[in-house]
Curated annotation (Swiss-Prot):
BP GO terms, sorted: translation
InterPro entries xref list: Ribosomal_uS14, Ribosomal_uS14_bac/plastid, Ribosomal_uS14_CS
Protein name per UniProt: Small ribosomal subunit protein uS14
Record-linked Gene3D superfamilies: 1.10.287.1480
The organism's place on the tree of life at top rank: Bacteria
Gene Ontology molecular functions: rRNA binding; structural constituent of ribosome
Keywords, in A-Z order: Ribonucleoprotein, Ribosomal protein, RNA-binding, rRNA-binding
Family the UniProt entry places it in: Belongs to the universal ribosomal protein uS14 family.
Stated role: Binds 16S rRNA, required for the assembly of 30S particles and may also be responsible for determining the conformation of the 16S rRNA at the A site.
């Protein structure tokens, strides 16, 4: 089980990403626009750098919804490999069955 502080830190990051997503997208659009002048691009880069570091989507790490484990988390289920196996063997994940060939 992950520490509660680590789980809360990830939740805080997710909130920051949602809060600044619009601004971040606008600045990136200006930077990537071919018609933007060098001065506009430069100002947009400065503003983008002044945003909080944790407002970047790449800073958010997927965690298991049950244990908070940060590694081996399946996106489709939101569970780590250990809990996914445990729930699958108990029949709690609909449509999932053990492979056999």
């Amino acid at each position: 089980m992950a520490k509660k502080s680590m789980i809360q830190r990830e939740l805080k990051r997710e909130k920051l990403v949602a809060k600044y997503a619009q601004k971040r997208a606008e600045f990136k659009a200006i930077i990537l626009d071919i018609n933007s002048t060098e001065e506009q691009i430069w100002k947009a880069q400065i503003k983008l750098q002044k945003l909080p570091v944790n407002s970047s989507a790449s800073r958010v790490q997927r965690r298991c919804k049950v244990t908070g484990r940060p590694h081996a988390v399946y996106r489709k289920f939101g569970l780590c490999r250990n809990k996914l196996r445990e729930y699958a063997m108990a029949g709690d994940v609909p449509g999932l069955k053990k492979a056999s060939w």
